[in-house]
Amino acid sequence: MPKSVIIPAGSSAPLAPFVPGTLADGVVYVSGTLAFDQHNNVLFADDPKAQTRHVLETIRKVIETAGGTMADVTFNSIFITDWKNYAAINEIYAEFFPGDKPARFYIQCGLVKPDALVEIATIAHIAK
């Protein structure tokens, strides 16, 4: 089955050759998402909660553009720059997944911009 490119209205141009999301066979693949403004500047430097909220709101827009909801999320890959932000990120994360939680993993690493604190890539299965 062919894939569909998912680009929500108002999305900024990516820094590299990719799109915000793709849809294939009822599965939405959301690219790694950071807290960027329309010009790819990092938002909310030094605020892991605000960055996480912005990232998850952006992911929600991609999934909703594809016809799904956050309840359809089955897996998240979470990249953080410092373990000291783990609890703050989890606090906001829990607001977006109040029911059954998706599977996920965390990894500490450097991100594309120094002020970025969290990046999340997502997979969602949309019921037909």
Curated annotation (Swiss-Prot):
InterPro entries: RidA_CS (IPR019897), RutC (IPR019898), RutC-like_sf (IPR035959), YjgF/YER057c/UK114 (IPR006175). GO terms for cellular component: cytosol. One of its GO terms (biological process) is uracil catabolic process. Pfam families: Ribonuc_L-PSP (PF01042). It catalyses: (Z)-3-aminoacrylate + H2O + H(+) = 3-oxopropanoate + NH4(+). Keywords: Hydrolase. SUPFAM superfamilies: YjgF-like. GO terms for molecular function: deaminase activity. Its EC number is 3.5.-.-. Transmembrane segments: none annotated. It is an enzyme of class 3 (hydrolase). PROSITE patterns: UPF0076 (PS01094). PANTHER family: 2-IMINOBUTANOATE/2-IMINOPROPANOATE DEAMINASE RIDA, PROTEIN HMF1-RELATED. Homotrimer. Involved in pyrimidine catabolism. Catalyzes the deamination of 3-aminoacrylate to malonic semialdehyde, a reaction that can also occur spontaneously. RutC may facilitate the reaction and modulate the metabolic fitness, rather than catalyzing essential functions. Belongs to the RutC family. This is 3-aminoacrylate deaminase RutC. It comes from Shigella flexneri.
